[in-house]
Amino acid sequence: MKKAQIIVDKYFLIGKTDKRIYGSFIEHLGRAVYEGIYQEGSPLSDEQGFRKDTLELVRELQVPIVRYPGGNFVSGFRWEDSVGPKTQRPSRPELAWGVIETNQFGLNEFVDWSRKAGSDVMMAVNLGTRGPEDAKNLLEYCNFKGGTYYSDLRKAHGYEQPHDIKLWCLGNEMDGPDRKSTRLNSSHGKLS
């Protein structure tokens, strides 16, 4: 057996710790999104349906960055279902957690929520049931100024300016029984 030793010296500084290490994620699991950060019509919520008490706590914690959609949910996420008029968004089976996803809280709501929380956005790309073409379309919707199909669609949804998302996450871990994927685990590295 090989042994190793680590010596920690608080006076030997290499550099500052990147504050993003204290980031978080939000997943459509249980009551994390619906009732946790979003509860339309509640006296605890603001005009967009965002829970004011949760926003206050996230601001107080100074969460620097939040990944969305987090966890296993991203592996079945159809971002197009989560944008546009809420009355036109489809409800679909959510495959990782076995519930119905109403898409009433989606991509644009998350960006708005993050801005109110004072957190940067890390957008996750579905590599479980989708792939590079979908990632390109999502990037176009979020970050292109205009003049393309998806950037103009974002504008039609009421977001004239790009979301300007700087950090992206390629999928989620794909090695457990509750992970949803259309490809072998070994192919995810190549896909990424």
Language-model features: where?
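Non-catalytic accessory regions flanking glycosidase/transglycosidase catalytic cores in CAZymes
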Residues: 1-183
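Single conserved hydrophobic/aromatic residue that forms the stacking wall/gate
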Residues: 184-192
